[in-house]
């Protein structure tokens, strides 16, 4: 059996770790352009 809850937590954690810095960089670039 596959434990979807654990997989979901791992995927969400990985997504946050990847998207977090990307969002910060995008916000920094937008502020820099303004």
From Swiss-Prot:
Q: What is its main location?
A: plastid
Keyword Isomerase included in the entry's annotation: no
Q: Which Pfam families match?
A: PSII_Ycf12
**Annotated keywords:** Chloroplast, Membrane, Photosynthesis, Photosystem II, Plastid, Thylakoid, Transmembrane, Transmembrane helix
Q: Where can this protein be found?
A: Plastid, Chloroplast thylakoid membrane
* UniProt GO BP: photosynthesis
User: Which InterPro entries does the record match to this protein?
Assistant: PSII_Ycf12_core-subunit (IPR010284)
Q: One cellular component GO annotation, for this chain's record?
A: chloroplast thylakoid membrane
What top-level branch of life does the organism fall under?
A: Eukaryota
Q: Where are the transmembrane segments?
A: 6-26
Membrane topology type = Single-pass membrane protein
Q: Does the keyword Transcription regulation apply?
A: no
Family indicated by similarity = Belongs to the Psb30/Ycf12 family.
Which HAMAP family does the entry mention?
A: PSII_Psb30_Ycf12
What this chain does, per the record?
A: A core subunit of photosystem II (PSII), probably helps stabilize the reaction center.
Q: How is this protein organized at the quaternary level? A: PSII is composed of 1 copy each of membrane proteins PsbA, PsbB, PsbC, PsbD, PsbE, PsbF, PsbH, PsbI, PsbJ, PsbK, PsbL, PsbM, PsbT, PsbX, PsbY, PsbZ, Psb30/Ycf12, peripheral proteins of the oxygen-evolving complex and a large number of cofactors. It forms dimeric complexes.
What is this protein's name?
A: Photosystem II reaction center protein Psb30
Q: What is the lineage of its organism?
A: Eukaryota, Sar, Stramenopiles, Ochrophyta, Bacillariophyta
Gene name of the record? psb30
């Amino acid at each position: 059996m596959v434990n979807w809850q654990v997989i979901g937590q791992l995927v969400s954690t990985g997504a946050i770790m990847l998207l977090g810095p990307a969002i910060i960089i995008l916000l920094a670039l937008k502020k820099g352009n303004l």
